Amino acid sequence: MKVTVVSRSGREVLKAPLDLPDSATVADLQEAFHKRAKKFYPSRQRLTLPVTPGSKDKPVVLNSKKSLKEYCDGNNNSLTVVFKDLGAQVSYRTLFFFEYLGPLLIYPVFYYFPVYKFLGYGEDCVIHPVQTYAMYYWCFHYFKRILETFFVHRFSHATSPIGNVFRNCAYYWSFGAYIAYYVNHPLYTPVSDLQMKIGFGFGLVCQVANFYCHILLKNLRDPSGAGGYQIPRGFLFNIVTCANYTTEIYQWLGFNIATQTIAGYVFLAVAALIMTNWALGKHSRLRKIFDGKDGKPKYPRRWVILPPFL
């Protein structure tokens, strides 16, 4: 089988077509392409079928696990594919590890080290119990996130553009420093013991619930990474489409009830907006896929992310 690789403008990317056996898969094509163009390793390649000029149809993305024959017309023994360079890639585990490592290391710096001394405050600073519990709560959360990244999460995509590492790290690391600065500040005014206990108690329950939601989501995904959508079921997923986001938002609400800083609530608002946008997209996608037609189950009526509001 001869495979011609062209750019989106129609220009041939390789000087000559690739010669592959008839039994070759898309993954074999990607490896052969990589051997001819060393720069473009498989996770950097996006291969699609050509689209007729003027057509509004979306290009069909080639599945790496499928045979190339499945994309050929009839008995045709040649194929043209369109190549797009996705840019330098990094694994999702690497991305998540670094974005979570920052807050895990930055927050204790403001608690344990004399940061405020260099900002003009005296050496004798009273550390309130809520500040100690907040540090433990914060570190537990991000340590849990890192463990989930390596031992729980299954990713539908193997890699992410390397630029996302800098963007995500800027988001998590800057908010980590912003919140840590105010919660551990020498002039920080603690809330009442009752409010602190309610906040941290509620937050810890949500952290445990969040972990269980991730276990349920893991069990929905094929270990081989084959992808595909399923209706999430069990526990909070019986009433909320994105229960993992729900518990994530509410666990930060618990943290902010206990610590009560503007910085913390700004982070909560931004995170809630981002996750709500993701949840609306996922809810809409699941309802579209599971429409009750052609033998498919109908997606049940559920809250999207924030019962009883949305």
Curated annotation (Swiss-Prot):
Keyword ATP-binding included in the entry's annotation: no
GO CC aspect terms: cytosol; endoplasmic reticulum; endoplasmic reticulum membrane; fatty acid elongase complex
Cellular compartments annotated: Endoplasmic reticulum membrane
Deleted gene: phenotype: Abnormal organ morphology and stem glossiness. Impaired endocytic membrane traffic and defective cell expansion.
Pathway(s) annotated for this protein in UniProt: Lipid metabolism; fatty acid biosynthesis
Gene: ECR
Tissue: Expressed in roots, leaves, stems, flowers and siliques. Detected in mature seeds.
PANTHER family in the cross-refs: 3-OXO-5-ALPHA-STEROID 4-DEHYDROGENASE (PTHR10556), VERY-LONG-CHAIN ENOYL-COA REDUCTASE (PTHR10556:SF28)
Protein's organism: Arabidopsis thaliana (Mouse-ear cress)
Enzyme Commission numbers on file: 1.3.1.93
Complexes and interactors: Part of the fatty acid elongase complex which contains a beta-ketoacyl-CoA synthase (KCS), a beta-ketoacyl-CoA reductase (KCR), a beta-hydroxyacyl-CoA dehydratase (HCD) and an enoyl-CoA reductase (ECR).
Enzyme class: oxidoreductase
A molecular function GO annotation: fatty acid elongase activity
Name of the protein: Very-long-chain enoyl-CoA reductase
Stated family: Belongs to the steroid 5-alpha reductase family.
Membrane topology, from the record: Multi-pass membrane protein
Catalytic activity: a very-long-chain 2,3-saturated fatty acyl-CoA + NADP(+) = a very-long-chain (2E)-enoyl-CoA + NADPH + H(+)
Membrane is among the record's keywords: yes
Main location: endoplasmic reticulum
Role, per record: Catalyzes the last of the four reactions of the long-chain fatty acids elongation cycle. This endoplasmic reticulum-bound enzymatic process, allows the addition of 2 carbons to the chain of long- and very long-chain fatty acids (VLCFAs) per cycle. This enzyme reduces the trans-2,3-enoyl-CoA fatty acid intermediate to an acyl-CoA that can be further elongated by entering a new cycle of elongation. Thereby, it participates in the production of VLCFAs of different chain lengths that are involved in multiple biological processes as precursors of membrane lipids and lipid mediators.
Pfam families: Steroid_dh (PF02544)
Keywords: Endoplasmic reticulum, Fatty acid biosynthesis, Fatty acid metabolism, Lipid biosynthesis, Lipid metabolism, Membrane, NADP, Oxidoreductase, Transmembrane, Transmembrane helix
